[in-house]
Design a protein with these regions (language model features):
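Surface-exposed loop/turn motifs in large extracellular/passenger domains
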Residues: 1-56, 62-81, 87-107, 113-132, ...
Length: 140
């Protein structure tokens, strides 16, 4: 259900007890979103990963409008895709992604998968493996 929320969010995943199988991956979590499933969120989002095997990390909403900044920090674990914004919709703020360990198997986008980013993107990578890197959106 769509709604309007005003708050900051914090999501953290510290790991799992199994080894990922690259041929038939089993994910600790399929998708992590820093924001809402839909609707409007006014506030900043924070997603932290220090271990585990995650399919997708989105700093913002799955859909809808986020007014605030998004922050994604990865210090360990394995992620397939990282997007600083959301899956779709609009982010009225800045996105930042810090990867200081672990690996990103398929890519990082500073913006959204598709939608509108009304701010700046910042990506910092240190001591990590990343397949590909895009400063803006994945599609449009």
């Amino acid at each position: 259900k769509e709604g309007t929320c005003q708050y900051d969010t914090y999501v953290m995943l510290a790991g799992s007890s199994f080894e990922p199988d690259t041929e038939n991956p089993t994910y600790t979590v399929w998708g992590i979103y820093g924001g809402n499933a839909g609707g409007t969120l006014t506030g900043s989002t924070n997603v932290t990963l220090s271990g585990g095997n995650v399919r997708n990390i989105y700093g913002g909403n799955q859909e809808g409008v986020l007014t605030g900044d998004t922050h994604v920090a990865i210090s360990g674990g394995t992620v397939q895709y990282v997007l600083g914004g959301g899956r779709s919709g609009q982010v009225n703020g800045n996105t930042s992604i810090w990867v200081t360990g672990g690996s990103v198997a398929n890519g990082i986008c500073g913006g959204l998968a598709e939608g509108t980013l009304g701010g700046n993107t910042s990506i910092h990578i240190e001591n990590a493996q990343v397949e590909s890197l895009y400063g803006g959106n994945e599609y449009s």
